[in-house]
């Protein structure tokens, strides 16, 4: 399949005028494709992180330096979007999964067009909803899933990044949960960023630190950044904190990591009226779900329940794509009580 954003320029032009006749000028041009900036290779580093930063910032910096080999190159783009979804809330889960799709949003037109054509063929336009990992067992979405995954790999320029954190790690911001979360709750309240409880503060700060860390590596001067999230604890409008507080927290944390200026930072959460944004949001939903299942299988040795649809998503997450980088990082509690991390390398069995 041809790349969805192919461009051409005149590589060479030779003027062939007839002598003394300027209205009869002819041109011969060789048209050559632009060399597309698709991916960039490491090493990478969070250049603003110092010893004064929280432990999680240092951990992310070590992950970036040691475990990230490649990232998408967005240097020619104007709008970057990050779609997020999270898993692991159920009691049987061994990990909290935080999944993010960073995408060159100014290039999503072909993806949107192809998805609409696909949905029309499968009767999925009228009742528009996400491709959710928990709800793919039958029906039109199950039949459309192979084509959907192919369109994701072929028409999205970006990266799907999943960070899985061992549930035995109760906080990534200090040595002890009670002390670390107490400090976070107090600081957020004093800064006018909402009155959070401990688990809520832990979750929102994990998420915005991950977004900001990778935004520092992926965005460039004067680009626009949009964060579009599924509805979740961190963006609900409650009595003591609300989505505006979450937005303000991200803006503060972006300043901790970015050395360049963004033109605009925008925010949205999943709308009642569904559309192509939710087709993008489905990507981290599928990634968070399948990584959760794969890590659980690795921990317990038990087979993952589900049919061909889940097997298909496992094959998708493990298969490299030309335009879409797929990165999964595991953060675990070590036998000695310390914290370890590593890239989760997956392979498809033939």
Predicted regions and their residues:
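Phosphate-ester processing/binding pockets and catalytic centers
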Residues: 2-81, 86-350
